[in-house]
């Protein structure tokens, strides 16, 4: 039995293929999703040794794009993240980029990894600045979202970071104040430097324009919100 999403893509498959010209990975995931649960693609037969009843279970596609398999993946992922969160107050932060940079990540998906590298370096530096000898280390989880609420391409990083960290002495130190000026400027600098290193001299003009148009850095949401880590992991997962 097909679901609504499968029916939509089956009805408009050729339009998607010949008008939108999606990437190979997109086509592969759509194909898998369309055929998910189709008995003609195989399955497993289970039998009860007591009553003699047999049940055939068709194979699933295991694609995150699939509304059935993707939901299971999301549940497993959020469960895994919840086990890794330390018992401390956390802050939900969102790191965004200049709209002019978005097409670079759309055309080369490998660049998305730079977002993680940039955010990670900023978080470590923010805690390091508090006490350079102790070098406090926080606990944090980074999750990439590639689309905004309007469903348009808008890669950004959601970060769940502990409001405190462990120092070299083994002591825990709380951190309630997050310096917005530092976070915005540091993230802008870290990301643009990484992109220039990856893209070469052709990126220099774009980099200079970003500094000129974003003198206060890229927008970052990091307000104190007393977030419930379990609720946030469900959202960002």
Task: Give the role of each language-model region.
Residues 1-237:
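Beta->alpha loop/short-helix hinge microenvironment recognizer with preference
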């Amino acid at each position: 039995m097909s679901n609504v999403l499968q029916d939509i893509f089956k009805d408009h498959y050729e339009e998607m293929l010949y008008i939108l010209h999606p990437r190979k990975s997109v086509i592969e995931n759509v194909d898998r999703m369309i055929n998910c649960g189709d008995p003609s693609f195989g399955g497993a037969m289970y039998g009860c040794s007591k009553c003699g009843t047999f049940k055939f279970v068709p194979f699933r596609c295991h694609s995150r794009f699939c509304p059935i398999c993707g939901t299971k993946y999301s549940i497993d992922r959020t469960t895994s993240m919840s086990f890794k969160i330390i018992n401390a107050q956390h802050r939900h932060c969102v790191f965004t980029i200049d709209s002019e940079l978005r097409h670079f990540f759309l055309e080369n998906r490998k660049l998305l990894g730079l977002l993680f590298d940039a955010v990670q370096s900023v978080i470590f530096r923010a805690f390091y600045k508090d006490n350079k000898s102790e070098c406090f280390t926080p606990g944090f989880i980074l999750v990439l979202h590639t689309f905004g609420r309007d469903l348009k391409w808008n890669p950004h990083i959601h970060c769940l970071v502990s409001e405190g960290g462990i120092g070299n002495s083994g002591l825990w130190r709380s951190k309630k104040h997050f310096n917005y000026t530092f976070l915005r400027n540091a993230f802008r600098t870290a990301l643009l430097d990484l992109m220039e290193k990856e893209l070469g001299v052709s990126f220099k003009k774009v980099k200079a324009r970003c500094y000129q148009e974003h003198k206060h850095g890229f927008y970052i949401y990091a307000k104190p919100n007393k977030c419930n880590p379990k609720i946030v992991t469900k959202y960002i997962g």
